[in-house]
């Protein structure tokens, strides 16, 4: 059994080790401590200083490390463990990229359009928080005797966030309470009881003018306007451009999200403003939007992000260059080859290799890892 390759994952504390051997039992196991009944190579890996657990399924391992441990120290020990156990030369080659490094997915559970729970999901952690009791009470008021609650409830995608998961939860909670103020709950209940919610597709959209937005002094009202904004058009750019200068990060972030929905190269200068925002959350969100659009014209701006102080932003830049870059970006990539964040350094190395070899970009599927049972 050899190591075929080592891949980064969305979690900075987890690496995927792809093996030449595929389990025939189609089972999965999580190992946290050395035990005699376990495979020898698993125990050897668990004996490595810094490794906290190993998830084994199909043909790969998900190896977790302690937050303060260093992958650059651990990975050679992992390779050596396989070499010692199998007496074969491992072939570690071309790690593959994943699109979601550092992301925390935010979702809102609703029933007939009434929110009552938030869920955050990262690569290796899930956090839930119920909204204040009044939201649950109003959700209950919207139920009828014939409602199938399990079928009719719906998770709304609130987009991706970045940072400490508890701090993200605090911020998302504030945004949700702003978007759905308590004063609006009776209206939502009335609508829920009057309308047919068999498909549960209700969402309140309202277009606002630049003058109306500009006249609003309360940032929470401005955020609520943007959160209820329909898909924008070119005519909405002045309003969204104004929102990019808002003092509140959630407002600026939502403006970037809306701008990214205008699928045109003409929107790039406004997304570039997001790349230069003082908040790393806004910068990363702008980088994500640019990556989704996939315009190579953005390469010069994304190259500048290789000097960003936040690794989640630098990683996005390296990822974009991996996908869209060419020989013109090689000098910049090589100048940053010694990035102090291992995950960023790995993406830069992969971008250099892809460009020099002319290979196509590859993605990774993490469904099994996301659904693993610890």
Curated annotation (Swiss-Prot):
GO terms for molecular function: oxidoreductase activity. The keyword Metal-binding does not apply. The keyword Cytoplasm does not apply. Gene3D superfamilies: Leucine-rich Repeat Variant, Scaffold protein Nfu/NifU, N-terminal domain. InterPro entries: ARM-like, ARM-type_fold, Nfu/NifU_N, Nfu/NifU_N_sf, PBS_lyase_HEAT, Virulence_F_dom. Keywords: Virulence. SMART domains: EZ_HEAT, Nfu_N. Required for hemolysin production. PANTHER family: CONSERVED VIRULENCE FACTOR C, PBS LYASE HEAT-LIKE PROTEIN. This is Conserved virulence factor C.
């Amino acid at each position: 059994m050899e190591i075929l390759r080592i891949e980064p994952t969305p979690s900075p504390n987890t690496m995927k080790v792809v093996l030449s051997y595929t389990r025939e039992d189609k089972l999965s196991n999580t190992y946290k401590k050395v035990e005699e009944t376990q495979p020898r190579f698993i125990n050897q890996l668990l004996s490595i200083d810094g490794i906290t657990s190993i998830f084994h399924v199909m043909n790969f391992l998900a190896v977790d490390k302690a937050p303060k441990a260093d992958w650059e120290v651990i990975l050679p020990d992992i390779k050596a463990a396989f070499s010692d156990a199998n007496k074969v030369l491992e072939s570690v080659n071309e790690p593959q990229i994943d699109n979601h490094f550092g992301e925390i997915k935010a979702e809102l559970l609703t029933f007939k359009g009434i929110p009552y729970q938030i869920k955050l999901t990262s690569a290796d952690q899930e956090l839930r928080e119920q909204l204040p009791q009044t939201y649950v009470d109003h959700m209950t008021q919207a139920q009828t005797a014939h409602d199938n609650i399990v079928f009719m409830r719906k998770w709304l995608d609130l987009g991706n966030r970045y940072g400490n998961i508890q701090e993200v939860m605090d911020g998302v909670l504030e945004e949700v309470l702003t978007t759905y103020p308590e004063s609006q709950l009776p209206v939502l209940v009335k609508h829920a009881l009057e309308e047919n919610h068999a498909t549960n597709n209700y969402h309140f959209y309202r277009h606002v003018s630049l003058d109306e937005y500009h006249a609003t002094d309360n940032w929470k009202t401005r955020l609520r306007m943007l959160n209820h904004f329909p898909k924008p058009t070119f005519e909405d750019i002045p309003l969204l451009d104004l929102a990019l200068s808002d003092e509140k990060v959630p407002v600026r972030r939502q403006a970037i999200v809306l701008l990214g929905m205008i699928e045109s190269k003409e929107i790039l200068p406004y997304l570039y403003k997001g790349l230069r925002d003082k908040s790393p959350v806004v910068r990363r969100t702008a980088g994500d939007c640019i990556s989704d659009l996939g315009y190579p014209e953005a390469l010069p701006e994304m190259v500048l992000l290789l000097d960003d102080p936040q690794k989640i932003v630098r990683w996005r830049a390296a990822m974009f260059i991996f996908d869209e870059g060419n020989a013109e970006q090689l000098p910049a990539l090589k100048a940053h080859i010694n990035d102090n964040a291992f995950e960023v350094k790995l993406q830069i190395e992969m971008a250099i290799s892809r460009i020099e070899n002319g290979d196509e970009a590859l993605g990774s599927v993490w469904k099994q890892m996301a659904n693993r049972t610890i």
